């Protein structure tokens, strides 16, 4: 009976060790994926920053991705140039307001 208990304990130890190694491998892969996502976040353009040269590079907000909004600026010389910034479109602001209000009411 003692031999059976020793063999069972040994098997449990081996199984737990091998499964923990597999979990460590998965965690390492997830860590690499998270690092790649973090690099992408660093490269995106934050809210209220200029996006004239990269109109699709705005970061994500709380619920939606910011949109590159452009306006035409007339200089004192009369030249027209386009200036763009990352911002939240009005319909996204309205949706965020409704969701925030719903969270306050329903907890």
Swiss-Prot record:
Cellular-component GO terms for this entry: extracellular region
Compartments, as annotated in UniProt: Secreted
Residue ranges annotated as propeptide in the record: 21-41
Domain of life: Eukaryota
A Gene Ontology molecular function term of the record: toxin activity
Alphabetized UniProt keyword annotations: Disulfide bond, Knottin, Secreted, Signal, Toxin
PROSITE patterns in alphabetical order: SPIDER_CSTX
Disulfide bonds: 44-59, 51-68, 58-86, 70-84
Nucleotide-binding as UniProt keyword: no
Pfam families: Toxin_35
Segment forming the signal sequence: 1-20
Tissue specificity field: Expressed by the venom gland.
UniProt entry tagged with the keyword Secreted: yes
Family from the record: Belongs to the neurotoxin 19 (CSTX) family. 04 (U1-Lctx) subfamily.
Record remark on domains: The presence of a 'disulfide through disulfide knot' structurally defines this protein as a knottin.
Name of the featured protein: U1-lycotoxin-Ls1b
């Amino acid at each position: 009976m003692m031999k059976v208990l020793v063999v069972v304990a040994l098997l449990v130890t081996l199984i737990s060790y091998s499964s923990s190694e597999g979990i460590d491998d998965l965690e390492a892969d997830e860590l690499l994926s998270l690092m790649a996502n973090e690099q992408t976040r660093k490269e995106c353009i934050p809210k209220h920053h200029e996006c004239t040269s990269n109109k699709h590079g705005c970061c994500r907000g709380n619920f939606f991705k910011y949109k590159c909004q452009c306006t035409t600026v007339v200089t004192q010389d009369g030249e027209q140039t386009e200036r763009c910034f990352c911002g939240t479109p009005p319909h996204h602001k309205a949706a965020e307001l409704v969701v925030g209000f719903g969270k306050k009411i329903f907890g």
